[in-house]
Curated annotation (Swiss-Prot):
Pfam family, any one: CobS
Name of the featured protein: Adenosylcobinamide-GDP ribazoletransferase
Electron transport among keywords: no
InterPro entries noted in UniProt: CobS
Catalytic EC class: transferase
Family classification: Belongs to the CobS family.
Lineage: superkingdom: Bacteria
Localisation: Cell inner membrane
Biochemical pathway: Cofactor biosynthesis; adenosylcobalamin biosynthesis; adenosylcobalamin from cob(II)yrinate a,c-diamide: step 7/7
Gene this protein is translated from: cobS
Reaction equations catalysed: alpha-ribazole + adenosylcob(III)inamide-GDP = adenosylcob(III)alamin + GMP + H(+); alpha-ribazole 5'-phosphate + adenosylcob(III)inamide-GDP = adenosylcob(III)alamin 5'-phosphate + GMP + H(+)
HAMAP family in the cross-refs: CobS
Membrane-crossing segments per the record: 31-51, 55-75, 109-129, 135-155, 183-203, 227-247
Cofactor: Mg(2+)
Length: 247
């Protein structure tokens, strides 16, 4: 179960103490448990909506969204900001783009990207709660945590070192494809809404993958984080929009 605890420690701020430093093989296997960590995150969010169901929807949405960011430590938002800064500041140059991604400071474009994504997510969570569709909150983080598997399975990793290299080199491919396929079927519980949402989600990932390859020749940890945030936002957005047009 070491890979599960590695995944839980990496993807959340939960106080998990590992007895030893994870090996490259353990890091690679840990990615298989990312969707399970997403289930834990989504389950907590849904549980909060059930416990505080009597609160005004706007306040409850703020609580849920703040809790979501807190549970993940803003990990993927950091990747989104770094990617946005690098894409604008890199001026189309691969080496400059990769160099900017390594800069720990956050520029104005990075801040703007976080603000836009957070505003959209907050508004969409509010609509889910108001329309009694909070159950979908469980599904969102699960789908978001399958993004790394999809990208690492299909896209070159451009850096020679780092966690991403371990994940790429030691990811169990067959098991990862099976888990990914199962996770992608989950939104079908919501029938046409879920189908439209998952198709839009996959289209967004295909597009982002194309953009990443065109600019830097593949992916980095930051671009994977950005893809998670953008993919989740697209997933909720299309689910909410289809709810009003199909129900």
């Amino acid at each position: 179960m070491a890979p599960f605890w590695i995944a839980l420690q990496f993807l959340t701020i939960l106080p998990i103490e590992l007895k030893t430093i994870p090996t490259a093989q353990q890091n690679g296997r840990a990615i298989l448990f990312y969707p399970l960590v997403g289930l834990i995150i989504g389950g907590i969010l849904f549980l909060v909506t059930c416990i505080f169901v009597k609160l005004p929807a706007l306040l409850l949405a703020a609580i849920v969204f703040a809790l979501w960011i807190w549970l993940t430590g803003g990990l993927h938002l950091d990747g989104l900001a770094d990617t946005a800064d690098a894409w604008v500041g890199g001026f189309g140059d691969k080496l400059r783009t990769l160099q900017i991604m390594k800069d720990p400071s956050c520029g104005p474009i990075g801040v703007l990207s976080i603000v836009i994504v957070c505003l959209l997510k907050f508004a969409l969570i509010y609509v889910l709660i108001e329309q009694h569709q909070s159950l979908f909150l469980i599904c969102i983080p699960i789908l978001g945590r399958v993004v790394p598997s999809i990208l690492f399975l299909t896209t070159p990793y451009v850096r020679e070192k780092g966690l991403g290299r371990s994940l790429t080199d030691h990811l169990p491919k067959t098991a990862s494809w099976i888990i990914t396929g199962f996770v992608l079927l989950l939104p079908l519980y919501w029938e046409w809404q879920g189908l439209i949402a998952i198709i839009s989600f996959l289209i967004s990932l295909v597009y982002l993958r194309h953009v990443f390859i065109k600019r830097i020749g593949g992916i980095t940890g930051d671009t994977v984080g950005a893809a998670i945030e953008i993919g989740e936002t697209v997933l909720i957005f299309t689910f909410v929009v289809s709810y009003f047009y199909l129900v």
